[in-house]
Amino acid sequence: MSDINDIANRPTRMLEAGLLFGVAIDAIRVIKVEPRTGGQRSALVSVVFSVIALESFVNEMTEHAQNMSSIQLAEVGVFAQMMGDAEEDRASLDFRLRLAHWILTGRMMDRGSQPYQDFALLIGLRNDLVHTKPNRLYTYGKTTNEEAHSRLMKRFRDKNILAEENSASWTHLVQTRAVAEWSCRSVARVVNEVCSGTSQSDLQKTLTFVNQMFQSYIAGIF
């Protein structure tokens, strides 16, 4: 009984990453049309909140490692120090994620393969939404998506997730259920990549718990 009381009275930290990822997943559920039908605004929620959840995951794991006792594996101390330094230096989410992967798994994340490529593409899309630039001039019935949105079309050509209809608005093209699903899958895969292959430690237990939340959300929607 004393052990139970000790656990009950022990300070705990509520982790937000899973909850935020749930927001991205819930936004998928409300889209009831064909996967590549454009103009589904909830898809933008999935794009933005999937990345927010990923950044929350990185920040919370850094803070969690920093609050651990010194009686931990050396890699936990290295993770806490280097990830904390990267955050103080305002390093990009891309860099911090690759740094976390290297420290925890002992392997560099392959930037030329999945899941990194989709992750990088997603970060770029989120940034384009947050820092939206004007659309190009568009003549209805004449201008094609390739002409009006050449950069977007080139980046996503092989994904087959953009809206299939022509549109003067580039954001209309990414407002599809297919884009929303791809965003959440990409984040869940990169979280799994970071959490897999870590050594046994208290940090690893937390990583496993958080990873299971992300993967269970994915399993529940697909």
What do these predicted regions represent?
Residues 27-36, 65, 133-136, 194:
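Secondary-structure edge/capping motif, primarily at the C-terminal ends of alpha-helices
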Residues 66-162, 166:
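Flexible secondary-structure boundary motifs
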Residues 40-65:
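Short, hydrophobic, well-ordered secondary-structure elements
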Residues 24-27, 121-128, 141-221:
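Amphipathic, Lys/Arg-enriched alpha-helical patches that create a basic surface
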Residues 13, 20, 50, 115-118, ...:
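Amphipathic alpha-helix face/heptad-repeat signature
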Residues 29-32, 55, 62, 188:
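Alpha-helical repeat scaffolds in large eukaryotic proteins
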Residues 1-44, 48, 212-221:
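Charged alpha-helical initiation segments
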